[in-house]
Amino acid sequence: MSFVGLHIHSDYSLLDGASQLPALIDRAIELGMPAIALTDHGVMYGAVELLKVCRGKPIKPIIGNEMYVINGDIEINKRHRRFHQVVLAKNNQGYRNLVKLTTISNLKGIQGSGIFARPCINKELLEQYKEGLIVTSACLGGEVPQAILKGDLDHARQVAKWYKNLFGDDYYLEIQDHGSVEDRLVNINLVKIAQELDIKIVATNDSHFISCNDVEAHDALLCIQTGKLITEEKRLRYSGTEYLKSAEEMHLLFRDHLPDDIIETAIANTLEVADKVEAYSILGEPRIPHYPIPPNHTPETYVEDIAWDGLLERLKCRERADITPVYKERLEYELRMLEKMGFCTYFLVVWDYIKYARDHGIPVGPGRGSAAGSLVAYCMKITNIDPVHHGLIFERFLNPERKSMPDVDTDFCIDRRDEMIEYVTQKYGEDKVAQIITFNRMTSKAVLKDVARVLDIPYAESDKMAKMIPVSRGKPAKLKVMISDQTPEPQFKARYDNEPWVKKWIDMAIRIEGTNKTFGVHAAGVVISSEPLDQIVPLQKNNDGAVITQYYMEDVEAMGLLKMDFLGLKNLTTLQRAVELVAETKGIELDLDDLPLQERKALQIRARTGSKKLPDDVKKTHKLLEAGDLEGIFQLESQGMKQIVRDLKPSGIEDISSILALYRPGPLDAGLIPIFINRKHGREEISYQHKLLEPILNETYGVLVYQEQIMKMAQDLADYSLGEADLLRRAMGKKKAEEMQKHRAKFVDGSTKHGVPSRIAENLFDQMVKFAEYCLSFGTEILTVEYGPLPIGKIVSEEINCSVYSVDPEGRVYTQAIAQWHDRGEQEVLEYELEDGSVIRATSDHRFLTTDYQLLAIEEIFARQLDLLTLENIKQTEEALDNHRLPFPLLDAGTIKMVKVIGRRSLGVQRIFDIGLPQDHNFLLANGAIAANCFNKSHSTAYAYVTYQTAYLKANYPVEYMAALLTASSDSQEKVEKYRENCQKMGITVEPPDINRSQRHFTPLGEAILFGLSAVRNLGEGAIEQIITARDNSEEKRFKSLADFCTQVDLRVVNRRAIETLIMAGAFDGVQSNRNQLLHDLELVIAWAQKRAKEKETGQLNIFDSLTAGESIKAKEAANNGFEQEPSAPPVAEFSLQEKLQLEKEHLGFYVSEHPLKSVQRSARLLSPINLVDLDQYKVRQKVSAVAILVAVKKIITKKNGQPMAFLTLEDMSGQSEAVVFPSNYERLQDVLIEGSQQMIWGKVDRRDDQYQLIVEDLEPVEEVKMVMLDLTPQEIANTSTQARLKQILQSHAPQKEQMKIPVVACINEGPTKHFIRFGENYWVNDYGTAVASLQELGFRARLEPLLPQSQSVG
């Protein structure tokens, strides 16, 4: 006999259910269940996932909800008794009613507060939405069982009768047996009531975990939820029988108190319930919202009118007859396609909210992704990119030969994104708009610590174990891997194997690893519906009160709902802020959208006239790009890109677009970048395999760069329609042999008809195929949002709908759904070993992200010994990584480190796979490596527009742009320092914060920039607003003293810590220069100010406080000073310079008073140290010296031979640079590798990943550096005999390889003047004393001299 589980909780019963749906369904099938119901507590989070997981499997999904029912008004939050009630959807109508009830309970029926809050309904709602529902009496928490337990059988009958009357045969009494006395009592009486009222009984097991082996782990989960220890007696605990039971196990229950025939019937009735449930048809066609159309219009005619009017405006034509045929025909074609595919209303919805943004001054991006290929979108000002001019293809956006929803993602200013959500909410109705939920799962590190806490294991112990788990590039290793023979950390496994208590702890954690812990909100997605959402998806409120769906993004889209991505981007905020500052300081109104058009116009004029002149603003922009001054320039900031841009010398947006596609993910080998550059500058001949290719490839100098070029080749050479060409592009991705053969034959046949020799046509087709031929092997695991790590071969072969993690151009991690699944046939696969112990299995040309954000072929990374980007400690469980487009940079999402590829081996020919993505074309593997795939021209052109806008503003309005950039970077001290250094190079001074002048943002002051308060640590928005408001409201519009400040501001908002930070950052220097004194005064001043504030509140004012504002301020001050002196502590000395500098660096990220190396640099000039920022001016392997502070020291153990080495971050007065100490020198130098120390460094210039660094050969604390000083006359210098003797002595004291090298300097006395000559390194010596003694013995005036004068301290 079979059995159907009708009372099942998954991990969507957050921190109560431990069953993940895929494993749960697999186990149910294994147990022979023909169906299964999902009844999570009060929510329907997993309903659509349940349908997806069960699809194609021999099990029927039943959507349900274990709801909470009260007797009373659900909108009045009283201490109502809450009763459990299992509600199942019998059919589509039942699903709709269940959605309605779930939504009402979550939006209006929350009873209780905090962790005790529950979403509730009442019987009136059940009466209203009863149709299509099956209801059971639930567990011991149900109203009927509760009445029985209280001994009130009459009330129990009454309640059961009410449900029977309402639901008829769709009401069942539910018996459970978890071994308690209460279960037996309730079951016996339920059977009696059932017989009396003719109600059927169903047997259930209240399942919260899958296996009986999960009991302890589930108990730990409950303790994590409630914050209790497992050892505590008074806490929530289950019986341990709440697992998924088989039919056989169910038959063994109830026998001690119920007859066999009752048990048999109750189990059989579970099948009856399952049979009643019809297949749901809730996943459906697109539900595009209704857009209000003006009278006498249809959506089609309205779009047509807007588009034509927009095109006339764009092209500056008066009549349609004036429009050139290429635009006219393209627009007519696109409008026909939109009408045919039914997407005109969709375009109106997007047009409307973008129009609202533009009309209200909300910055909007120029376009994103393939939408930039639509002329209709350009005409309607949805995008600002002319697809005709740029050769973009509509079919990359919408293909009539494969109907799918368009996807127009829109970038808005991050500060005003919420306004856009509010607008569409008001436009379409609160009941039709919602944001989207996300779920945060428990990763190995997090679950290990959580379980440790409930087991009362000390934090230090759990932290130590958690730190052993490698989290390289995105995902902590699973605990099962950590205890396996393939463990990346043997010590972790050894403790698991040898310490029983550690084994118990880890085994418990393994059982709940990966379960849902909390929910969050999708950072971009907004759902807009044509009908009330509560008829389609269950809704709830987020913690901030916003309405969100209970289904995550992919499930919402599967329902046919329109999901819009409202992306909040800092970059747009920076641009808008810069434009506003230009208007304020220069009185010039700039139109960002017009800047690329003005460049295009200037280039067209130059091409037409043959003139070499360009307008000054365009010329400045191009010069900035050529110079490689690219800090703060969108997409071009990496070291590698800077060099490429310098070499390329872009002459327009087209060049920028091409280089973005070449450098970032794309189809080309890295070696094609030099070819592209050389062809542009005429150093290499541009050649085409056939003349028909010239118009397609001429803008990229004959180099195949974009997917669109493949489509055009198919169209122009082989007579494909663009729709067919898009299918060809997709087919090349899937690489199915039969399909590819058909396309090959068609392409070659069509090409030969156009006079292309078949040999060339075959070659071209092969080139196009190779365009997408970098792939991963079957077993390579990709990190998916829904299921964790999955083999790419499984994802592709089963076309699993899931999302992956990607990195956007601003370095932020977000999620996006897989759009295409590519089986690329067979090819050689190599296994690349990383120094952290993980491996990557891929074709040699698959691209991965390096530490300076280059995407390079893995083989090149290995060959050049470059570093892969590594992300550690991703905050996935803290409502972060699962969110679409995270509101923080990659650097803040986790800890970046470098990992080398240390080995490789061939795995032979294997089947290979890849995936297609709608936005940024990269994704995280399960071991965290960031892999890449193809790039399209629409995407890179859209990026190129923003790149040009940022370059234009920096070149023409540098102070305003850098002020805006610093403001946008206020939340990152590292970025503030980076851009401040760039300001310094540009001759722009960034002045320190000033309590009387600084605003919230960085502000231009002539040719300088005043530090913004938002970038000072420990100052929240409230404190900043309070300071500025108090200052503006004061009589003198300034603070006269620390005491004046403390009396003017609300000290509850601007707390002591904030004031201390302002003092240490130098913000009070304008009122009192002794920072140490201010810190000593602060406690007294705060107490005094608080006392005055209290007296003011109670009316106990000093008589002089009552003087009117019109009276003499001096008289008032004199009076108050006479009677109530501002307090101060006994005088103290000011901090030393080094102490002040250290505090400035800590609180601002840079030095204000002066750089700590200023005096050191002056003394060290004898040794000719270089500026770190000038490393790229020296030859690779050239020996140099530098004076620098060790900002960061990261010591590692090499995996290859277990030897220690170190990576350093150095800083001098010019900026920062990286350095490395290899094992050969590490042991000798390790004692002086101290963070914060000032060192004299000797080493060689190195270039890795197109970034220059130092290979350290020697270093010494600057205060310990000594020189051998030789006093010589000009005659002695000129004497060849003297030279020979000097050479002989110095070389006799030459240091061996491992010895310290001591500089030798000659002081040339020429009368009253002296000058110094530093001997070359070949003449440096190995020992101070013996070298000086030898020189003195031969009559030379030699002495030992410290680098720094004795009076000079480095603190």
Swiss-Prot record:
TM stretches of this protein: none
Protein location: Cytoplasm
Primary residence: cytoplasm
The reaction(s) this protein catalyses: DNA(n) + a 2'-deoxyribonucleoside 5'-triphosphate = DNA(n+1) + diphosphate
UniProt keyword Ligase, yes or no: no
A cellular component annotation (GO) from this entry: cytoplasm
EC number(s) on file: 2.7.7.7
Gene Ontology MF annotations: 3'-5' exonuclease activity; DNA-directed DNA polymerase activity; nucleic acid binding
Chain's role: DNA polymerase III is a complex, multichain enzyme responsible for most of the replicative synthesis in bacteria. This DNA polymerase also exhibits 3' to 5' exonuclease activity. The alpha chain is the DNA polymerase.
PANTHER family, per database record: DNA POLYMERASE III SUBUNIT ALPHA
Protein name: DNA polymerase III subunit alpha
Organism: Synechocystis sp. (strain ATCC 27184 / PCC 6803 / Kazusa)
Taxon lineage: Bacteria, Bacillati, Cyanobacteriota, Cyanophyceae, Synechococcales
